[in-house]
Regions:
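P-loop NTPase motor core
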Residues: 96-183
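Conserved nucleotide-binding/hydrolysis micro-motifs of P-loop NTPases
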Residues: 49-53, 95-96, 156-160, 201-204, ...
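Hydrophobic/aromatic ligand-binding patch that stacks against planar heteroaromatic rings
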Residues: 35-37, 142, 187-188
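Surface-exposed alpha-helical segments enriched in charged/polar residues
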Residues: 70-73, 77, 138-141, 287, ...
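Conserved GTP-binding G-domain of TRAFAC-class P-loop NTPases and closely related GTPase folds
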Residues: 162-273
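Interfaces that engage single-stranded nucleic acids at replication/repair/recombination sites
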Residues: 2-4, 16, 31, 39-40, ...
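Conserved P-loop
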Residues: 4-91, 95-100
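Short, well-ordered beta-strand core segments
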Residues: 43-45, 150, 195-197
Length: 341
């Protein structure tokens, strides 16, 4: 299982371009979030929210969570091959995708609302919100680590904040759900390399045409935005796919110069585990949990591989399913303080 060698890591470099980057576009309606996202290279729109009728790029309606999981599986099973067709994956919107995930959890446990999935006893139900967050993170992380440019679209909301220095209270724009510390929306926001807050600029009085939205790229007193790169500009006056790409490339270039790091094109590094890796990783978990929670272990395996299947029956095409089993069992042990040797 020699996938990572901490004593033979490559020299630090920064990868230019938007490939492999995670972007978030936040804002109210009619600011060009979906339209400009579809103008990035080789886009695929995953439409969790109905409203893509004016978008001409390839799109898949995400009307249930299992469909999203299937798309992620196909995109990540052979991401190099998938990137010959798609380079930009657009999730529109984050909050609707979260709803699809929570709806799936409700159906699984036969309740009308996720808050009704209460008991932490595995023989009954786990905590619904925690379970949904884990499922959501697993799929979003898999998609985000596959080498695509992933664009997450979300709405914005205005919240009242207090300046910690002056004590002044004022309204500030945030991506939807960001102020809820444990929310999946906040997880996505924190995951992104760039978070852009879009604001309207009104109508040109001479032409009576709508002026392109402005993109706020770094946090201000009135709007949340962020970048992992300190050299990112504060504003993009005209929000277009080309201007966003140029701003990102310039920020990375300046950051690399300041840090004395090399600048290279994005290349996908494979740190993924194969089937045999997962067989070895799962052995101690099965040995620990099967005697204590046989029904739970059987249920987890059946949900991923099918009824009456064993871990060792998994094929090379079921590596993602083995990963899901591993994540589920390891999360279960961590949440209950179970030590696995």
């Amino acid at each position: 299982m020699a996938k990572i060698d901490i004593f033979n890591l490559p020299k630090p470099v920064m990868q230019t371009g938007v490939a492999g980057k995670k972007l978030m576009f936040a804002g109210t309606n009619d600011l060009g979030k979906s339209f400009q996202s579809a103008r990035f290279p080789k886009p695929l729109l995953l439409a969790a929210e109905a409203g893509g009728s004016a978008i001409t790029c390839p799109q898949i309606p995400i009307d249930n969570w299992s469909k999203f999981c299937e798309v992620v599986k196909q995109l990540t099973a052979d991401s190099t091959k998938a990137q010959e067709v798609y380079q930009t994956i657009i999730v529109d919107t984050v909050e609707e995708l979260v709803s699809r995930c929570e709806e799936s959890v409700c159906r699984r446990f036969g309740v009308a609302d996720i808050s009704l999935v209460q008991s932490a006893d595995v023989k009954k139900n786990p905590n619904g919100y925690s379970y949904a967050r884990n499922q959501f993170k697993q799929q979003v992380n898999a998609l985000s680590n596959a080498g695509f440019c992933v664009i997450f679209i979300t709405h914005s909301e205005e919240n009242e904040v207090t300046d910690p220095i002056t004590g002044e209270t004022f309204k500030k724009l945030f991506p939807f759900g960001y102020n809820k510390e444990k929310s999946s929306n906040r997880f996505v926001c924190n995951l992104c390399d760039f978070v852009f807050m879009l604001v309207p600029q009104g109508v040109d009085p001479e032409t009576n045409k709508t002026i392109l939205s402005k993109a706020i790229c770094k946090e201000t007193n009135r709007a949340f935005a962020r970048s992992r790169f300190t050299q990112m500009q504060t504003y993009i006056e005209a929000f277009t796919a080309e201007n966003v790409t140029a701003a990102i490339e310039e920020a990375i270039k300046k950051e690399a110069e300041n840090a004395g790091a090399g600048l290279v094109e994005f290349t996908q590094v494979n740190h993924n585990f194969n089937r045999d890796d997962y067989f070895e990783m799962l052995k101690p978990y099965i040995a620990k949990l099967a005697p204590l929670y046989p029904e739970y272990v059987a249920k987890v395996i059946a949900e991923q591989l099918g009824e009456n299947r064993k871990i060792t029956s998994a094929t090379e095409d079921e590596v993602a399913e083995l990963g899901a089993i591993y994540d589920e069992l390891s999360d279960f042990c961590c949440s209950r303080g179970i030590v696995v040797d």
